[in-house]
Amino acid sequence: MADNDMWTIKAALDWTVGFLERKGDENPRLSAEWLMSEATGLSRIELYVNFDRPLTLDERAVLRDFVARRGKGEPLQLISGKVPFRYITVLVAPNVLIPRPETEVLVSEAFAELKLPRVADHIATGENGEEVVSPELPELRVVDLCTGSGCIACSIASEYPAAHVVALDIAPEALALAEKNVVALGLGDRVEVRGSDLLGALDHDEKGSFDLIVSNPPYVPTKVCDGLPREVSEWDPRLALDGGEDGLDLFRRFLPDALSYLKPGGVLAVELFEGHLDQAFSCACDAGFEQTRIAQDLTGRPRVLVTRKPR
């Protein structure tokens, strides 16, 4: 991509696709469009109606940097610094698990199990035109265990205005990023980030007080971790991936405490490895949970365990 050449969007896009193909990118066209969109501020559709527009020097410099990073295998989400998650956009950063679309199903299943009232029925318009939440909307107390970027905690709080979420993680990098996302999304009054080894940072007087504990813990079996694609193994922290021999090490550890911190009838929803949901089902039943079910992810694989504390 020489500086003295005229580079239109189409020419730069074609060059980027070819470069990424040679670097072994599995989806070079998708990657090229994503990078071009980030560099120009145009949507992927807008790129195609602006094929003949020349790139500015600044856009070319940004694109050149992005393409070089992608050529080294850096995930697109880290290059752009953000990722959409359900109805929000969250910041991402190195050494923190990148949110995946599959995890959106975890939030959907948790909401479905709780059978919450329609938020729209409890929203009124204030004197200055602002939205006002009715005090009749039931409060929802939530723990997001292994919060990572905070995508789950922030998503729940943004979608349900009466939710108060405690977001827990042990990794300093994750805690810092989660706090940034809470502030960026204006959720500081309803999402509290705490450093914690599993549920250890919850207070004794909080036992029996939570409606929902939701978690995307490290759940990849160790042997599977060793064979993960480079884009995952080199950029997502091992701490956020490796769940031990069968992927259930942390799940087994926090089950008893989850039972004690939930209200009677409270919900536990956990994303887990597709091959070991049956074992997780048995673990939950043995720990005293009931009404346990398994939900599939977007690809039809078993992914989420949902269960309840007895009433």
What function would you assign to each model-found segment?
Residues 245-308:
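Conserved Class I SAM-dependent methyltransferase catalytic core
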Residues 105-227:
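Conserved SAM/SAH cofactor-binding pocket of Class I
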Residues 34-113:
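Conserved AdoMet
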Residues 219, 308-311:
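C-terminal beta-strand of the catalytic ATP-binding
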Residues 110, 156, 232, 254-258:
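Class I S-adenosylmethionine-dependent transferase superfamily signal
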